[in-house]
Amino acid sequence: MKKLLSMLCALLTAIGLPGCDYVNVKELQPGVSTAVEVRQRFGPPQHEWRNEEGSVTWEYSRQPEGAECYMITIGRDQVLQSIEQVINEQTFARVERGMTPEQVRRMLGRPASSQYFQLKQETVWEWLMERGSTLNDPTYFTVSFNPEGRVVGTGRYTKLRP
C-alpha cells in the first residue's frame, strides 16, 4: 500500500499537482536520503542553483496555484542535506532593497506572476502565500523592482473573490 501511495504521489507531482508534497517531505531524511530518491519523489527540479561549497539546491515551486516552494539541497556526495519550504515570513523578511531579481528568485523561487506598471516604471513579482478557502481569500507577497532591476519595496495583498 505504501509503495502504491508513493507511486501515485510521484505521478501527481510529475503532472504538477502538489497534493503529495507533505508525504514526500516526511519520507525524505536529510543525511540519509539520496538525490535519486528526491528525484523519484519530486521529479526534475524547475531550477538548479549551484552553491559555493559544491552542493546544489533544487527548486520545486508550486506557484502559481500552490503556496509552496521547496528548496532541496543535495551535497557533493549526492545525499540530501536539507529541505526548506521558503514561502514563509522568515524568508520574506530577508528580501532587502537593492537586491537583484536573481537574488530574490534564489530565495523565494519562481514567482506566481510578474507584471510591469508603466506609470510607476516598476516590475512587480508576486507569490501566493495562502491559497484561501471558502472562508478566506488568497493572499500574495509582492516584490517591486525599479528599471535598473533592483528591489525598491515589498508588500502583500489579499485578492478578494467575486
Locate each region found by the language model.
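Sec-dependent bacterial lipoprotein signal peptides
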Residues: 1-18
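Residues within mature, well-folded domains
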Residues: 20-162
